[in-house]
Each structure stands twice: as C-alpha cells, then as structure tokens.
C-alpha cells in the first residue's frame, strides 16, 4: 500500500479545470505540478471546487466539502493541508478551526510577514489573478489587518491573462503572460518605488517569479 504524503494540496474539481489552466499547470513552480516540490505532495481534487465557488462566490457547500476532505486526509496521516488558489483565504478561519492539522489555504497568509520585513517605510504589492474578486473579506481572513502599506495589482485586464476568463479553452501564450506579470509590477514599482516585496495571490504565477526577481530586484512570495 502506497504511503500517504504528509502534505496535501486541495485543488479544483477535475471536471472544472480549463485548457488554459491545464497549460499553466505544466510549468514547474505551479502549485498543482508535482515537479514543483522536492518531496511528495498529495494533490486532491475537491468536488464542487471551481472558479465560481472558490474565486467568485465562496459558499457554505464548498466549505463543508473542504472540511470533509480535510478530515478524511487527516485520518490517512496527512499533517498539513494547503490549496491551489489564493482566494481560498476566504475559508482559512473556518478550515483551521474545523481540523486539528496545520491548514494554510492561501499565499496571502504571507502578507503580514512581508509587511514586517519591508518595514514601516516599505510597501507590499499583492499581484492577484483578478482584483474584482479579491475583497476586503479575503484580506481580513488572511489576517491582513494593516492595509496602509499594501497595494493590490491585478492581471485580469492584461490581454493574454484575460483569456483565463474570456477564452478558457482557447490558445494561451505563456511567454506573453510572463511579460505581462513583469509589466504590471514594473509599472507599480515606477508609481511606488518604495515597494519592497511582492506576494502572488495566484498559485499559477510562481513560475514567473524568477523573472520578477531578476528584472525588478524584488523578493517574491
């Protein structure tokens, strides 16, 4: 019998992953690519988890399913549970309270840490897949209580990235997306040269982190 990994990642329902997202998953660094990790991670599809229930309209039904899956994973020996989408910050408090294992639903949980290291005179830039869906509630549930030095930048208006929403099963240029990621943050840095760190909300963006570090000289979380 194959031994269950100690870390599990909750990902979208297998029937709800578009061709564009599948292409992003081929990149090392993407949260759902097994090659992103130097150790075994259980990648677990969760029924009902999709663009709507995770990003746009979080709901009790998905929370209930998350809790059920987390408890099942814990019974199999999993000790830490994360997810494949930063918008799952919405479920952080409830999930952490419902299961005894360590739960870290979102990269947004790193924002308070980033705020600390840039100091009171620096700013933290959050780069999100879609700022229209990233609410104050998401930030609050990620324990981002101080918004004074937090800036939010979005990919949703970038021509290539917008295909995630407008043409999810059509062609998708990964090189163009990389350029868009750097471009959005470069513009942000020009407007706010005191930006000292970047946090990617979206777990499809880490494959492009090295470009940001190399070209803009910023740490990326």
Question: What would you call each of these model-derived segments?
Answer:
Residues 1-61, 130-133, 139-172:
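N-terminal glycine-rich anion-binding loop in soluble enzyme alpha/beta folds
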Residues 107-138:
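Hydrophobic, well-structured mid-protein blocks that either form specific transmembrane helices
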Residues 71-77, 115, 189-191:
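Non-catalytic positions within long, well-ordered alpha-helices that form the structural scaffold/packing
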Residues 13-16, 80-92, 107-110, 129-133, ...:
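Gly/Ser/Thr-rich loops at beta-strand to alpha-helix junctions
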Residues 94-118, 213-221:
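Short, acidic/small-residue loops that bind anionic groups at enzyme active sites
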Residues 60, 64-69, 87-94, 98:
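N-terminal active-site wall of soluble small-molecule enzyme domains
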Residues 176-210:
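Charge-patterned, long linear interaction tracts outside catalytic cores
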Residues 55-72, 176-184:
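Glycine-rich, highly charged phosphate/nucleotide-binding loops
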């Amino acid at each position: 019998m194959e031994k269950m990994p100690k870390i599990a990642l909750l990902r979208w329902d297998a029937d709800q992953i578009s061709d564009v997202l599948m292409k992003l998953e081929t990149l090392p660094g993407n949260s759902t690519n097994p090659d992103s990790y130097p150790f075994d991670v259980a990648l677990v599809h969760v029924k009902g988890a999709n663009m709507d229930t995770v990003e746009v309209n979080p709901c009790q039904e998905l929370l209930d399913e998350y809790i059920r899956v987390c408890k099942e994973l814990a019974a199999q020996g999993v000790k830490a549970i994360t997810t494949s989408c930063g918008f799952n910050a919405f479920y952080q408090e409830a999930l952490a309270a419902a299961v005894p294992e360590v739960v870290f639903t979102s990269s947004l949980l790193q924002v308070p840490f980033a705020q600390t290291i840039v100091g009171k005179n620096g700013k933290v830039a959050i780069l999100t897949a879609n700022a229209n869906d990233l609410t104050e509630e998401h930030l609050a549930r990620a324990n981002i209580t101080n918004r004074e030095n937090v800036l939010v930048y979005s990919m949703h208006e970038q021509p290539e990235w917008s295909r995630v929403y407008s043409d999810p099963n059509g062609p998708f240029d990964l090189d163009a997306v990389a350029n868009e990621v750097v471009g959005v943050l470069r513009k942000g840095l020009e407007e706010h040269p005191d930006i000292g760190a970047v946090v990617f909300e979206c777990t499809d963006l880490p494959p492009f982190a090295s470009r940001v570090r190399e070209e803009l000289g910023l740490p990326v979380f």
